[in-house]
């Protein structure tokens, strides 16, 4: 059988900020029904890579392919139109609006006129009905879909952002530090939610500094250093210590030492 084709693929991405090289020929692949984590030290190029994949910036060189077709995202709107949704670390939710309005933010449902023309009046009943069904499908617990987001906990707000991405993403979702600044219980809820999103058939890219979360969620782990992909590992093939050693540019001897430290019985 032939290898599955990547849903999203990048080859040789380069990005300069003056004399600073943020991406230096970076490669990336995301396959159907998988979670890929991107890890790396500060300045490794993780955020720049994600911004290029989500249309937040344009690479100076290289190419991006979506379902095998070369694409050029000139804005996040281009990526969204192509079916890529991104959950940013700062969430980008509207605190004063209710949950349903946040799910439909920028995509509000409106009543149709007698000739099929869209009217300005929002169809709040439809938005609340669809949002409630979506939350039930993802097993997200809230008191009411009419709650203003500002009344929610940090974990629940993150759940709203993830649910919005899952509703509108046709191809994949990108999540930047999805559990940052959350408590233990809220973190558990978000991790479980990301798993359910993937189980629903949506592949996911995550950036995280939390290695236990990365090793719990990810099918594959892309390790970046100095703007390049230096390795792709799995939780089965490498330990956390080994992944960190690769990430920091450890020597072969140091990597062997990391492997020895985590051998069973040691």
List each model region and its residues:
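Glycine-rich phosphate-binding loops of nucleotide-dependent enzymes
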Residues: 2-266
């Amino acid at each position: 059988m032939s290898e599955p084709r990547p849903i999203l693929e990048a080859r040789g991405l380069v990005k300069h900020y003056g004399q600073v090289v943020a991406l230096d020929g970076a490669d990336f692949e995301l396959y159907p029904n998988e979670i890929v984590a991107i890890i790396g030290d500060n300045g490794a190029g993780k955020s720049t890579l994600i911004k290029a994949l989500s249309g937040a910036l344009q690479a100076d060189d290289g190419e991006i392919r979506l379902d095998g077709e070369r694409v050029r995202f000139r804005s996040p709107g281009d990526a969204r139109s192509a079916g890529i949704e991104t959950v940013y670390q700062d969430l980008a939710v509207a605190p004063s609006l209710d949950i349903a309005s946040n799910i439909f933010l920028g995509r509000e449902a409106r009543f149709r006129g007698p000739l099929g023309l869209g009217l300005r009046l929002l169809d709040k009943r439809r938005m609340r009905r669809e949002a409630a069904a979506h939350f039930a499908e993802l097993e997200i617990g809230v008191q009411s879909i009419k709650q203003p987001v500002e009344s929610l906990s940090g974990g629940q707000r993150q759940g709203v952002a993830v649910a919005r991405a899952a509703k509108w993403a046709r191809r994949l979702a990108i999540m930047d530090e999805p559990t940052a600044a959350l408590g233990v219980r809220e973190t558990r809820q978000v991790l479980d939610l990301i798993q359910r999103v993937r189980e629903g058939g949506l592949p996911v890219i995550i950036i995280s500094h939390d290695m236990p979360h990365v090793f719990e969620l990810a099918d594959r782990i892309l390790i970046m250093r100095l703007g390049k992909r230096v390795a792709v590992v799995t939780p089965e093939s490498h330990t956390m210590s080994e992944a960190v050693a690769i990430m920091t540019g450890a020597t072969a001897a140091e990597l062997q030492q990391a492997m020895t430290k985590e051998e069973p019985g040691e």
